[in-house]
Amino acid sequence: MAHIRKATGVWDWFDQRLAVTKFFKVMVSEYWIPKNISFLWAMGVILMTLFIVLFVSGLMLVMYYKPDVNLAFDSVNFTIMKEVEYGWLWRHIHAVSASVVFLILYIHTLVAIYYRSYKQGREMIWVSGMLLFIIFSAEAFSGYMLPWGQMSYWAAMVITNLFGGIPIVGDAIVEWIRGDYAVSDPTLTRFFMLHVCLLPLVVVAVLAVHFYSLRFPHVNNLDGEEIDFELEGEKYLQGKTSESKVIPFWPGFLAKDFFYVSIFMIFFFYLVGFHFDFAMDPINFEPANSLKTPTHIYPEWYFLWEYEILRGFYFDVGPLKAADIGLIAFAFAGVSLFFIPLFDRSSVVAPAHKNKAFFIWFWVLVIDMILLSLFGKLPADGAELGIENKYWGFALSIIYIGLLVVVLPLITIAERKRV
């Protein structure tokens, strides 16, 4: 039995029972961060800030939202926007943060790829981070359906129909997800439950795993230098702060991050106040109508590159229909970044600019994803530069898959042989 002495204060009382001092040291005050980093390392704290903003603004909105197909549209566009005091502000904050969180997620992910922060013991950091991306995607989609506008309804119809492509059990899965034969009231209430209850809990759990996985291999640095964190941490604790290559997570690292978060929040509230419309589709201000299909159905900007891969395969191959090939490619695109640690066959942990081939590969990947997003917003039957959009989509989709499955293994195998 543990020896419990009389506590000298509240902190000491908890410390004897929960070891809060030791926990604080391991997770915060003696968790060491390399000095050799830039503002790009602040993206994680910005993401955490946005998650809190989403949670608080979501709480304010859910007080007045009605998860009923006859009431949902009016509860958002009339009750919240016109009758609830500052309801418009909470909706704008929630919509903008839901969109901007993906911008920061993409930056965070691309920085990790550029500096190759997914190998040499950091694989679980990468996997848990990509799992967070998938869960945030599900959270975003379930939330997009709740206003019950035209694009909400038809996006739900298209996305749930995708599961119908699964052999044998596809139709049963679609009906199970919807709770009905068509997108209707049971579908709305199910997605409401996912958005406000289940998925946020999963996000919190995976966030905890992500933060915990950071504590052992520690974060990477600008040069990919291998640092003895225990030795450098001892130097810091001995007062040799200038000699040490590390700083503590608190106050050293977070104090700098608070500055970057402050700058970001200025940009964020500028969007909330003056350009909130970028996060809201005009078509979604029309009530859902199952008898009126929008001229062009497309997802939010952060899913456009995957959507273009889905529709990029416009031809049949033997027994495989175009829709089936597109669905397979779409499924691959959704999980492809999970496997970058496997596709990268080199043991070198160094930024992209130290390997010319990897540097070129990285920027071609970024440009390809941007182009996929641009064409994903355009109608498939249109044409750009005299070439039909479907051909552009197919070419860009093949380039994306080839960059990951073929090019990345080849250039990293060549790098491994040079080392």
Which residues fall in each region the model found?
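Membrane-embedded and interfacial regions of multi-pass energy-transducing membrane proteins
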Residues: 2-100, 104-419
